[in-house]
């Protein structure tokens, strides 16, 4: 068993090898599921490849205690730009809670069982699953833990995924459909991607090959993408006791609307999920139903920056780090710079489409639907602030300066 425990000391002790350096915390790449786009439009494409970011590192099999009663394990994930997801194990007298139990599917489940064994636990020891937000690398194992260990599922109250069958009758047992109905699950995903983008045009969606793999995996895409149904939904400010600590729920919309962080005010520990990562920035999607997801993200980041006496931040990808305030402020500054790039481009694009502005913000190799989505989120933020006007021409959104 490879389990590294902290030495004797206070609740704020931790292994220094687990903490990101300031240099790592000052670099940026864009974290987004199924896409990892670089931001700068004028970066030299011939430059030598950079060392992979810490979030891109392959999953380690080692289990490390990062704070008393909190173990960090890593599960491999097969998403471009990401090498692992941190699955935290929170120990207490009842057994353990796990945070973000990896991707759906047998491979990830096997790795989760292995990491629990390395920590000295089995699946039946899991009494609670915390899912920080509605992306598959975070909720994948939740339903299986619920079924096999009777584990409670904790999310923010707004938790919802694209795999939800939104037009199901309220009286239907959606949990059973999640587990047993590949047809319903695939139909929900196909409906989601069949909708036109809010800035015009058809969405690419998953390839037929991807959909076929999902149908074949485990015999059912329904079981692979079983959507967690929270048994303990939290609201902002609510407390929950895990790992002998009282955690405060913090609703942190931005990366997703349903994103949840947990804060231990007594010992200054923050589980940040994908909201604040040590060296890459989370994707802010223009597909979100909210009018201005970037503004929500800014507000959530400011809340992170205001948390007093943080001793350690525990992200979903990459290494734990100390300067949560500085990192949150740096991410805000980064997006403000992206907004300035758009402002500077407006005179040259007085009636620009989302695709036109995307080409200014992103490198050519990153052009595509995901880059357009984040560009749209930034344009809508400027429109909500009264700096741009949007109109549609033949179904395509165009942006012009006010006045």
Residue ranges of model-derived segments:
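Histidine-centered divalent metal-coordination motifs
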Residues: 130-138, 156, 253-255, 259, ...
């Amino acid at each position: 068993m490879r389990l590294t425990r902290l030495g004797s000391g206070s609740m704020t002790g931790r292994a220094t090898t687990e903490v990101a350096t300031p240099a790592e915390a000052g670099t940026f790449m864009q974290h987004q599921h199924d896409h990892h786009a670089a931001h700068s439009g004028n970066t030299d494409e011939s430059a030598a490849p950079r060392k992979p970011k810490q979030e891109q590192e392959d999953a380690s099999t080692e289990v490390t205690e990062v704070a008393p009663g909190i173990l960090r394990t890593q599960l491999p994930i097969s998403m471009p730009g990401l090498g692992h997801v941190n699955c935290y194990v929170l120990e207490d007298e009842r057994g353990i809670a796990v945070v973000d139990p990896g991707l759906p599917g047998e491979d990830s489940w096997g790795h989760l069982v292995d990491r629990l064994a390395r920590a000295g636990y089995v699946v039946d020891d899991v009494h609670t699953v915390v899912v920080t937000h509605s992306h598959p690398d975070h909720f994948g194992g939740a339903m299986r833990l619920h079924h096999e260990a009777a584990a409670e599922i904790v999310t923010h109250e707004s938790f919802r995924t694209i795999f939800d069958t939104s037009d199901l009758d309220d009286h239907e047992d959606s949990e059973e459909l999640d587990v047993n109905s590949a047809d319903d699950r695939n139909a929900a995903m196909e409906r989601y991607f069949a909708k036109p983008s809010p800035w015009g045009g058809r969405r690419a969606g998953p390839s037929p090959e991807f959909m076929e793999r999902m149908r074949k995996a485990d015999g059912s895409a329904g079981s692979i993408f079983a959507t967690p149904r929270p048994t303990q939904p939290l609201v902002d400010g609510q407390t929950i006791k895990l790992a002998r600590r009282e955690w405060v729920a913090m609703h942190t919309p931005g990366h997703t609307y349903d994103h949840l962080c947990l804060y231990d005010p007594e010992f200054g520990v923050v589980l940040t999920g994908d909201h604040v990562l040590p060296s890459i920035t989370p994707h802010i999607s223009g597909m979100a139903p909210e009018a201005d997801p970037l503004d929500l993200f800014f507000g959530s980041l400011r809340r992170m920056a205001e948390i007093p006496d943080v001793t350690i931040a525990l992200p979903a990808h990459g290494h734990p780090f100390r300067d949560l305030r500085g990192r949150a402020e740096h991410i805000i500054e980064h997006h403000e710079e992206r907004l300035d790039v758009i402002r500077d481009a407006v005179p040259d694009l007085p009636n620009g489409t989302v695709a036109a502005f995307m080409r200014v913000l992103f490198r050519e190799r990153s052009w595509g639907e995901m880059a357009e989505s984040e560009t749209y989120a930034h344009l809508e933020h400027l429109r909500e602030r009264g700096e741009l006007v949007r109109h549609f021409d033949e179904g395509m959104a165009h942006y012009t300066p006010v006045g």
